[in-house]
């Protein structure tokens, strides 16, 4: 028996999920506050729902990371069951960002250990199999393993760029398939902006590890093949983020969300646009997961 809703029914369902989601602006205030609160207090004040109480049980950073990853992947994979085609494929591709972040973090950890580049690259394929594809068809694996050719002169950052471009192309292609049934311009613009800001985070991580990152963000974004107006907007926002974080990069995530927040909210102003509403929910949940992680780790003070 199919659980798929009609497009109209899915619009209402996603609207309810948005209304029940924590307020991102409020989470930002909590993280930045001189008197921050913990998850338990946030639940008791109604800022978070009772379902977030499971993060109170975690005893280590690894436990927290695994619990948050599983919580949000399950939430979004469960959403796919109810969303009609072709929107379900958009969700399926978008949520690979959770896996992408996880794999890229592991790549930088390997590089921090100052292992030879070819050795690092040889370790990435089993890493992808374990993290990304352990519950998926092996037929999907070549989509990303094409980045692991380990050509002479290939760097870890080259692999990261390749992963990122494949991800962006996959999601953009699903959006273009949706353009046959409704306008996608707003969602596509916000997705490209979101992806640009994530790319900047990857470059920041690379530089913080004192790795070889001989690339400017404008060149990185250009290589992603984004439309020029969106690329210029992304670079403008990234330059502003840099001015805020150049003395302390631990503020990067906060300023990343602040730089996209108003445009993200604008997706809710498109009357009867299901794809805009769905895109809002997916990006909201990604940033929400990041802030819940900070609360769960008691990382409240940013000063």
Model-based region annotation:
Residues 1-303:
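N-terminal domain-start signal
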């Amino acid at each position: 028996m199919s659980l798929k809703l009609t497009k109209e029914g899915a619009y209402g369902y996603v609207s309810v999920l948005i209304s029940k989601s924590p307020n991102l602006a409020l989470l930002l205030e909590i993280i930045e506050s001189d008197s921050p609160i913990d998850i338990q207090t946030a639940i008791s004040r109604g800022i978070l729902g009772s379902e977030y109480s499971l993060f109170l049980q975690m005893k280590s950073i690894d436990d927290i990371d695994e619990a948050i990853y599983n919580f949000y992947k399950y939430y979004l994979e469960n959403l796919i069951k109810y969303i009609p085609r072709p929107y379900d494929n958009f969700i399926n591709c978008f949520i690979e960002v959770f896996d992408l972040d996880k794999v890229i973090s592991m790549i930088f950890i390997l590089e921090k250990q100052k292992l030879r580049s070819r050795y690092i690259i040889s370790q990435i394929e089993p890493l992808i199999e374990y993290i990304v594809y352990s519950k998926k068809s092996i037929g999907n694996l070549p989509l990303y393993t094409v980045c692991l050719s380990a050509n002479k002169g290939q760097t870890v950052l080259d692999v990261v760029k390749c992963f990122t471009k494949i991800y962006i192309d996959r999601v953009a292609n699903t959006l273009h398939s949706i353009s046959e049934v409704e306008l996608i311009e707003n969602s596509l613009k916000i997705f490209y902006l979101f992806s640009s800001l994530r790319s900047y985070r990857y470059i920041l991580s690379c530089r913080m590890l004192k790795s070889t990152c001989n690339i400017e963000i404008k060149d990185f974004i250009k290589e992603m093949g984004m439309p020029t107006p969106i690329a210029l907007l992304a670079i403008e926002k990234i330059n502003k983020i840099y001015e805020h974080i150049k003395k302390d990069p631990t503020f990067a995530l906060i300023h990343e969300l602040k730089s996209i927040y108003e445009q993200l909210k604008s997706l809710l102003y498109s009357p009867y646009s299901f794809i805009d509403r769905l895109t809002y929910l997916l990006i909201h949940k990604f940033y929400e997961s990041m802030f819940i992680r900070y609360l769960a780790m008691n990382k409240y003070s940013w000063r």
